C-alpha cells in the first residue's frame, strides 16, 4: 500500500502486507516510531533540490544532476532505506528510475552511451542489505510540468541485458 508519513496510521487500519513510501528529498530525514509487521518498499525520489536524478546522465544541466551527484543521492536513499528497514520485516526494497532523460531527441550515440553506462553506475552503489530495483519508465515522463523523453531502459532487451550483466 502506498503511504506517506502523515497518513501511515490511517493506512495501517487496512492491515497491508507491504508499505511503499514514495520519497521526496525531505524524506531523507524521515523518522518512524515503532516496529511494523509489514515489508518496506521505498520509491526513490525522482528529483532533489529541484533537479532530476539521472544515473546515466551525460552531464549536469540546470534541470538534471550529473551522474556522480545522482549516484551520491541514490546512495543516501539506499542508506535511509536500510535504516528504516530495521523497523520492518524482511529485506527492504528500493525502487529507482534509471534516468536517461532529455527534453529533446538525442543522437543515437548519446543514447547508447547512456545504455552502456547503467550497469557500471549501479555497481558504484553499495546495495548490500536492500533489494535494489530499476523501474522501467514510459517513453515520455512528466517532470516539472514538461514532457521529458526517457531514452533508456524502455525495451525488453534493455532490461534483459541489464539483468544478465548484473546477475539478476
Region annotations inferred by a language model:
Residues 1-79, 165-167:
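N-terminal pre-domain/capping segments
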Residues 59-168:
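Active-site acidic/histidine proton-transfer and metal-coordination neighborhood
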Amino acid at each position: 500500500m502506498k503511504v506517506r508519513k502523515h497518513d501511515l496510521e490511517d493506512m495501517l487500519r487496512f492491515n497491508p502486507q507491504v508499505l511503499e513510501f514514495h520519497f521526496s528529498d525531505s524524506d531523507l530525514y524521515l523518522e518512524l516510531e515503532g516496529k511494523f509487521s509489514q515489508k518496506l518498499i521505498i520509491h526513490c525520489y525522482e528529483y532533489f533540490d529541484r533537479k532530476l536524478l539521472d544515473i546515466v546522465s551525460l552531464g549536469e544541466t540546470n534541470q538534471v544532476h550529473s551522474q556522480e551527484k545522482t549516484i551520491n543521492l541514490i546512495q543516501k536513499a539506499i542508506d535511509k532505506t536500510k535504516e528504516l528497514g530495521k523497523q520492518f520485516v524482511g529485506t527492504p526494497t528500493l525502487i529507482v528510475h534509471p534516468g536517461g532523460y532529455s527534453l529533446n531527441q538525442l543522437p543515437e550515440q548519446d543514447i547508447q552511451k547512456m545504455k552502456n553506462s547503467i550497469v557500471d553506475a549501479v555497481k558504484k552503489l553499495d546495495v548490500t542489505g536492500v533489494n535494489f530495483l530499476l523501474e522501467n519508465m514510459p517513453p515520455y515522463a512528466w517532470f516539472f510540468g514538461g514532457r521529458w523523453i526517457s531514452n533508456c531502459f524502455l525495451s525488453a532487451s534493455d532490461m534483459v541485458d541489464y539483468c544478465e550483466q548484473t546477475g539478476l
